Amino acid sequence: MPEKEMKLVIVTGMSGAGKTVAIQSFEDLGYFTIDNIPPTLVPKFLQLLETTNDIDKLALVVDMRSRSFFAEIQNVLDQVENNLEIDFKILFLDAADKELVARYKETRRSHPLAADGRILDGIKLERELLAPLKNLSQNVVDTTDLTPRELRKTISEQFSDQSQQQSFRVEVMSFGFKYGLPLDADLVFDVRFLPNPYYQPELRNQTGLDKPVFDYVMNHEESTEFYQHLLNLIEPILPGYKKEGKSVLTIAVGCTGGQHRSVAFAQRLADDLAKNWPVNCSHRDKDRRKETVNRS
C-alpha cells in the first residue's frame, strides 16, 4: 500500500475545551490550520489541495453549530476514509461540565447552543450531540486539569513527528541599542561596557565577523571574563527551557551600534552553543551604519 501523502487532523470537541490552543499548537508543529470550517466545505477544500503538493499536514477545527452537525461531519469522514492518500485522525477535546462553566464565566462568553442563555443547558445539549463523534475519535484529551502549556505538550507528544518531539532551537542575535531592542528577545545582554573598536580607525569600518575586530574585542581581559560568565549562565538553563516546552529561545547581545562588540560576542556564543544545540545566528544591525553612510 502506498504511503499516505497528507496528514489530516480534525479537531473538535466541547466548546471551551481548548480548541483555540490546540489549533495554535498544530500550527507550531508545521500544520496548515483552519479554524471553525463548516463541515460541508471540508471535502471541497481537500479537493482543492489535490491540485498542489505544498501542504502535507493539515489541521481543521470543526465546531458544533447545529443539530445536523453529526450527519455533516459523518459525510466528511466517509469521504476522507476512502481517500487512500490521506492519513486522518480525529482529536476530541473534552472537559468536565463544572470546568467548562467556569471557563465560560471567566471569559463572559455565551455558549453557542445555549438558546436561553443558560451555559449548563448548552453544554449538556452539546455533549449529547457530540457523543457519537467522541466514540469515533482516535484521540480524546480531557483538558479539565490541563494548563494551556500542558495541552500544547500533550498535542506535541501525540501528533508531532519523532524529530519534532524534542525540537528546541536557540536563536542568537546581535543588535545595536541605538536602533532599539529586539521585540522577540527572551534574554538580552549588554556589552557596551567593553572596549569599543569603533575608536580604532583601522577597525571602524569592519565588523565583529572580521578577525581583527573579533580579536580586539575578545582578547581583552574583561571580555574573556565576562564571556565565560555568560556561557556558564546560559548553558545550564537551556535544558530547562526545552523541558518547559519552549521551541525557540532568542538570546540577544547588544552594543551601541550593533557592528563590532555585540557581533563578535553573539557569533562566539552561537559557535559554542552549537556544539550541543541547534543554533541560528543573525546580526540585525551589522551593516546598518554602512548603509546609512552610503545613503548620505
Curated annotation (Swiss-Prot):
> Coiled-coil region(s) at which residues?
none
Superkingdom as given in the UniProt entry = Bacteria
Q: Which Pfam families match?
A: PapZ_C (PF22740), RapZ-like_N (PF03668)
Keywords of this entry? ATP-binding, GTP-binding, Nucleotide-binding
Where do the annotations place GTP binding?
63-66
- InterPro entries attached here? P-loop_NTPase, RapZ-like, RapZ-like_N, RapZ_C
List the molecular function annotations (GO) for this entry.
ATP binding; GTP binding
Record has Nucleotide-binding as a keyword: yes
Show the Gene3D superfamilies listed in the entry: P-loop containing nucleotide triphosphate hydrolases (3.40.50.300)
Record-listed ATP binding positions: 13-20
Query: What is the purpose of this protein?
Result: Displays ATPase and GTPase activities.
Family to which the UniProt record says this protein belongs:
Belongs to the RapZ-like family.
Q: Please name the HAMAP family in this protein's record.
A: RapZ_like
**Record protein name field:** Nucleotide-binding protein SGO_0954
Query: Source species, please?
Result: Streptococcus gordonii (strain Challis / ATCC 35105 / BCRC 15272 / CH1 / DL1 / V288)
Q: What is the lineage of its organism?
A: Bacteria, Bacillati, Bacillota, Bacilli, Lactobacillales
